[in-house]
Amino acid sequence: MTMCAIAGVIKLTQPFEPGPWVDGMLATMQRRGPDQQGVLPLERGTLLHARLAVIDPEGGRQPMTWREGEASFSIVYNGELYNSGELRGELEKLGWQFRTHCDTEVMLYAFIQWGEDCLRRSNGIFAFAVWDHRQQKLFLARDRMGVKPLFFTLRQDTLIFGSEIKTLLAHPLVPARLNQDGVAEIMLVGPGRTPGCGVFQGIEEVRPGCCGWFDEKGLQLHPYWQLKAHPHTESFAETAAHVRYLLVDAIRRQLVSDVPVGTFLSGGLDSSLISSVACHAMAADGRQLHTFSLDYRDNGRYFQPGKFQPNSDTGYIRQMQDFLPAEHHWTVLDTPQLVEGLFEAVEARDLPGMADVDASLLLFCREIRQSVTVALSGECADEIFGGYPWYRDPEIRQQAGFPWAQTSDWRFSFLKKELAQGIDPAAFMNSRCEATLRQTDYLPEDTSEERRMREMTRLNLDWFMQTLLDRKDRMSMYSGLEVR
């Protein structure tokens, strides 16, 4: 497993000349990959990698290359495979011989063996690029849910890609320029982003579940996986047992690591469940779990309940701490710390984000990194299991548009007139919302309420969840911490 940063520059139609921008791009990747950095000059470009080593620190150096006869492939990979052992076993039966214990080699050989079909066989989170030396073309891919980021821009005959926007901006062909749509993205739908949009002019993002080739025909991306509706035939008891199996299996698979592992513990259902399963699984292996909880100075005095958080976390956290035989850690933040963290949070995210919410996660991850390198969190459980108020509130559910943002008037009022000219806030937001709704899959027998619930789920997965995944990735990796 390698949690890190990848980047590359490919120029197909003219001779390629590297420049000082290589060091500039690598410098932007340092925080995501503090352990190792690698550069591979190519016939038509360069592949870059910065690594936070989690599995096989010595054997997993990248970029990684395989050669046999005239065939040669090189990979830069960011992510983790939760079925790495199964894939490795299949490949070994087919004659592949492994030199390392890392996921990178598994993914490289799987791609060479099965091509694009390796993605459908993979259980994990990843973003990677493979250069085919013989055919002089590049393959890009991103995991199904978009946990791992992958941005790109096309400048004439040159493809520039990377794990973060700042890495692309370090190349001289990519100026940090906003057009009218970019301003609208920040002011109207931020901290979210339109799927596939990189906000800065000309910068895009490989969408979740998509892959494709860059060759003399250009960059051609397509989905290899899409969310589909299927009839639910299980009983309530069967559903509960099935969900339990999937959750326990996912948690156990994500505990695999050659470095210390911990869990976020907020006292909620998701983090409590993860911490409990992880604690017992690690105890069986003779390991002790570390849990990490966050509070704010004087939170008990000033806490105000709301729709998103009707209760303070502290009491539930203490109940779980009493229940679990783990080593528990508290982080208490004060307002001055959050204020100082605001600037770093924007630097980490490359864009305006969620203000103190980003800053608190950044500071929390930094504290956690003092004890462990990997942490499991319950991020996005509400998106998958329908935990938000708008799933339960019929009035909100039936309103058109994004359920979490019914109007943008207040935000739009901050723009100067010269910047606001030509932007229709309602039309912009409605067009983005409708584009997402058109991708919703239904069943013929769905009632109007069931259709609306599917639409709500789609909106949450494509917008709200992507915002949280983006936030988690940037804040944690900026701190040198891998959060799963």
Per-range role (PLM):
Residues H49, E216, Q309-S312, Y316-R484:
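Glycine-rich active-site loop/lid subdomains used to bind and stabilize high-energy intermediates
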